[in-house]
Amino acid sequence: MILLKNFSIRIAVFLYAILLCFSSTAAQNDTAPDVLVTQHSDAAEQIKIAAFPVFNLSGSAAPLNTISRRMMADLKEAEADATFIESDVLDSVITQYRIRYLGGLDEKTAEVMRQAAEADAVLIMSLELYSETTPPKIALTARLVSTTSPLEILWIDGIGLAGDDTPGLLDHALVTDPQRLLRKAVQPLATSLTNFLSGQGKKADSRTPKKKFGPEIIYRSAALAADKTYTVAVVPFFNPSARSFAGEILALHFIRQLWALGNFNVIEPGLVRQQLLQSRIIMDSGISLADADIIAHFLDTDLILNGKVIDYQDYRGYNGIAKVDFSAQLIERVSREVVWSVKSYHEGNDGVFFFDWGRVNTAYALASDMVQLAVETIE
């Protein structure tokens, strides 16, 4: 009887051990799909970007497709942490939905990109200057804009180069090949975007501006709080100068520098353009207070930045001087008062006395320094 009882206990223990083994195996099988789901979830988090064709603000013919391909190649080489939509797929969406304006993103275009192209963000590249005359010149601004509402500028950067910026002794470093200068310009932009996509976040302009290009006249109201975050809409500058698109170009400079400060939420210029069209606002000589009220109301902004481009000159070849002349002001929405304004005029050879040392050869590089120094007076 005792033996039978011990035998029964042993059988029960044996069966219990087998049951535990099956339970452990089943648990492992149950957890395996969770691991796969987690891996797919991480991959799904990679941002999907639609790179628009280069928008030409140079006023002259330029190899826009070559610039786009160069940018995509450099981003791929830098192993940017993003998925880029194939150009033929993007072209098909643009054609199907008749998207005509590629220099900015409005709500309707963003929805198309999000739904039809499944894009999380759009890369917008604007060409300001392109010249193959020796020494060649190029200027580019690029920005990444989210397609989810509210649209947000996630990243923006730019560059302006001339082949004779750093010619070196006996011109041994002079760049005469336009394609070489193009690669030299695009590569830093691709690196900057790659760094942002890797999680480094927004950074202020790393290049130190030349103090000699600071504004001549500055006004700043005490009502403008330095420790407050403002939402600002930058309106294209009134442009009586001889340079086509100078108003849009200078607006991009201010957007870039305000974004870099960190305490300004800058409205995507495509939304500003959309509101100007919908409200039928025509700036014959600048923006009026009534127009500023309309824009601030519909875009829900604290400040409106606008101004006037008096001169914006580039030159071809070796002989010439880059010139930039502008005024800008910030209008506060509630008080309808100007809380900040500047006036700035400079030439590329300001303060240059020997061997062209310190000379600035493109209006882009000159305006970049001037606008950065002007914007810094807001803080």
Which functions belong to the PLM regions below?
Residues 2-12:
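Bacterial N-terminal signal peptides that target proteins for export
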Residues 12-21:
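Bacterial N-terminal signal peptides
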Residues 26-47, 69, 113-116, 132-137, ...:
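C-terminal/domain-edge helix-coil "capping" segments
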Residues 46-48, 58-118, 122, 235, ...:
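N-terminal segment of the mature soluble domain
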Residues 56-59, 90-92, 128-133, 161, ...:
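Solvent-exposed loop/turn segments at secondary-structure junctions
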Residues 99-105, 142, 287, 319, ...:
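A short, hydrophobic/aromatic-rich structural module that often spans a beta strand
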Residues 138-145, 324-330:
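A short beta-strand signature
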